C-alpha cells in the first residue's frame, strides 16, 4: 500500500510544482525573452489548458491500457517540456513548453486519483485525499523559496532543470515502484444494469459532487490568482510581506488537512462538507464587510481552512461509484475543475470585476449552491456496492 501512496503523492505534486516553481523568476524570464511580465502571466492559463487537454484523453486511456503507462508517459512529457522551456529564446516557444508541461502534469494528476480509487475504500480514501491536499499545500510555500535559493546562484533556466529532474524522478517511481492497479474489465454480460447506471457520468450523485468540487477549486484558484493584487496593491503589503502571508495561509491549509482524517473518525463526511461550505460563506461575508487588513486576513484564512476540510471528502465521494471507470471519472473531475475555475477568472476579468469582488462572488455562490446540493443529493445506496474492485490486476 505504501508504494501506491508514495507514487500517487509524487504524481500529484507535478501539478502545483509546475505552477509555483517558476513564478519567482518571472521578471528575469520576461527580460531575457523580450516580453512583458503581463504577457508571460498568460503562461498560467496556458499551463491549465495543457492540463485540461491531457485530461480529455488520459482517463480513458488509463482505463483501457492501465495507470502505469499513462503515469510514465506523463512524467516524460513533463520532463521534456521543462527542458523546452529552459531552452526558449522567445515568448511563443516558452508558452509552448508551458502547454506541454500542463499536458504531462494533467496525465499524472488523473492517474494519481485513479490509483487511490483502485486501492482504497471510501473511508480510507477520504482520509488519504485530505492528507494529499495537505502535502499539496506545502508546494506553494516551498517552491518559491526553493526557486529563490536556486536563482541566488544560477540563471532562471535552472528552475526548469529542477522541474525536469522532478519529472525524471516521478518517471522512475512510476517505472520501478508503481504496480498496475487497473481492475480487470468485466464482459458486458457480467455487468448488471445497476452497475452501469452507478458508473454513468450523468449519475445525479456524481454530477452534484462534480459541481461541488469544481466550485471549491474555483474558490481556491481565484484566491491564488487574486492574492497578489489584494495583498500588495489593495492592502499595501511588500513582496516579503506577501510571501510571509501566503506561507501562513498555506500553513493553515496544512494543519486543517492533516487534522481532517482525525475529524472523519468523529464526524460524518456530510458534516465536514457542510462545515467547509459554511467557512466559505463566512469568509465571503467577512471579506465583504472588512474595513481593516486584520479582518481581511481572517477572511482569507477561512478560505484556506474551508477548502482543506471539505475538498478531499467531496472528491472521495465523487469517485466512489466508479470501480471500473475511475480514470474517466478522475479526468471528468479534473477537466471540470480546471475549465470551470479558468472560465470564472476569465469572465470576471472580462467584466472588469475587482479582485476582491471576484473572490467574494465565488465564495458566496459556491457555498449556497454546494449546501443546497449536499442537502438535496445524498449518496446512492449502490455506491457502497461499487467500492469493491471486481478483479485486481497483479501486473
UniProtKB/Swiss-Prot annotation:
Stretches that traverse the bilayer: 4-24, 42-62, 69-89, 93-113, 131-151, 158-178, 217-237, 247-267, 271-291, 295-315, 333-353, 358-378
Topology relative to the membrane: Multi-pass membrane protein
Family annotation (CDD domains): MFS_MdfA_MDR_like
Keywords, in A-Z order: Cell inner membrane, Cell membrane, Membrane, Transmembrane, Transmembrane helix, Transport
Endpoints of the signal sequence: none
Molecular function in Gene Ontology: transmembrane transporter activity
Periplasmic side: 25-41, 90-92, 152-157, 238-246, 292-294, 354-357
Cytoplasmic side: 1-3, 63-68, 114-130, 179-216, 268-270, 316-332, 379-395
One Pfam family, short name: MFS_1
GO cellular component: a single term: plasma membrane
Compartments where found: Cell inner membrane
PANTHER family: MAJOR FACILITATOR SUPERFAMILY MULTIDRUG TRANSPORTER MFSC
Family recorded in the similarity comment: Belongs to the major facilitator superfamily. DHA1 family. MdtL (TC 2.A.1.2.22) subfamily.
Protein name from the UniProt record: Multidrug resistance protein MdtL
Native source species: Salmonella typhi
Amino acid at each position: 500500500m505504501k508504494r501506491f501512496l508514495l507514487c500517487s503523492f509524487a504524481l500529484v505534486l507535478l501539478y502545483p510544482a509546475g505552477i509555483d516553481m517558476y513564478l519567482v523568476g518571472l521578471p528575469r524570464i520576461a527580460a531575457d525573452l523580450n516580453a512583458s511580465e503581463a504577457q508571460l502571466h498568460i503562461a498560467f492559463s496556458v499551463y491549465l489548458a495543457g492540463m485540461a487537454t491531457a485530461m480529455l484523453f488520459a482517463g480513458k486511456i488509463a482505463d483501457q491500457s492501465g495507470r502505469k503507462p499513462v503515469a510514465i508517459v506523463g512524467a516524460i512529457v513533463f520532463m521534456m517540456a521543462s527542458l523546452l522551456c529552459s531552452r526558449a529564446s522567445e515568448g511563443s516557444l516558452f508558452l509552448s513548453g508551458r502547454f506541454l508541461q500542463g499536458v504531462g502534469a494533467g496525465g499524472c494528476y488523473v492517474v494519481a486519483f485513479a490509483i487511490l480509487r483502485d486501492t482504497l475504500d471510501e473511508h480510507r480514501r477520504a482520509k488519504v485525499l485530505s492528507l494529499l491536499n495537505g502535502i499539496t499545500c506545502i508546494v506553494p510555500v516551498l517552491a518559491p523559496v526553493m526557486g529563490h535559493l536556486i536563482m541566488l546562484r544560477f540563471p532562471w533556466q535552472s528552475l526548469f532543470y529542477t522541474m525536469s529532474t522532478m519529472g525524471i524522478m516521478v518517471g522512475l517511481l512510476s517505472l520501478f515502484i508503481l504496480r498496475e492497479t487497473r481492475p480487470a474489465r468485466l464482459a458486458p454480460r457480467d455487468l448488471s444494469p445497476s452497475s452501469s447506471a452507478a458508473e454513468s457520468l450523468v449519475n445525479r450523485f456524481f454530477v452534484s459532487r462534480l459541481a461541488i468540487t469544481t466550485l471549491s477549486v474555483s474558490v481556491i484558484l481565484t484566491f491564488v490568482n487574486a492574492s497578489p493584487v489584494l495583498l500588495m496593491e489593495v492592502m499595501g503589503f511588500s513582496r516579503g510581506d506577501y510571501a510571509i502571508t501566503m506561507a501562513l495561509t498555506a500553513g493553515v491549509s496544512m494543519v486543517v488537512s492533516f487534522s481532517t482524517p482525525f475529524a472523519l473518525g468523529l464526524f460524518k463526511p456530510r458534516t465536514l462538507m457542510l462545515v467547509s461550505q459554511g467557512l466559505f460563506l463566512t469568509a465571503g461575508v467577512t471579506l465583504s464587510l472588512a474595513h481593516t487588513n486584520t479582518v481581511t486576513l481572517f477572511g482569507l484564512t477561512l478560505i484556506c481552512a474551508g477548502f482543506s476540510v471539505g475538498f478531499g471528502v467531496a472528491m472521495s465521494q465523487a469517485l466512489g461509484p466508479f470501480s471500473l471507470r475511475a480514470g474517466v471519472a478522475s479526468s471528468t473531475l479534473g477537466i471540470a475543475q480546471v475549465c470551470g475555475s479558468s472560465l470564472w477568472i476569465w469572465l470576471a476579468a472580462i467584466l472588469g470585476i475587482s479582485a476582491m469582488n471576484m473572490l467574494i462572488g465565488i465564495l458566496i455562490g459556491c457555498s449556497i449552491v454546494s449546501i443546497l446540493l449536499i442537502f438535496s443529493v445524498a449518496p446512492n445506496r449502490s455506491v457502497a456496492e461499487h467500492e469493491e474492485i471486481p478483479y485486481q490486476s497483479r501486473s
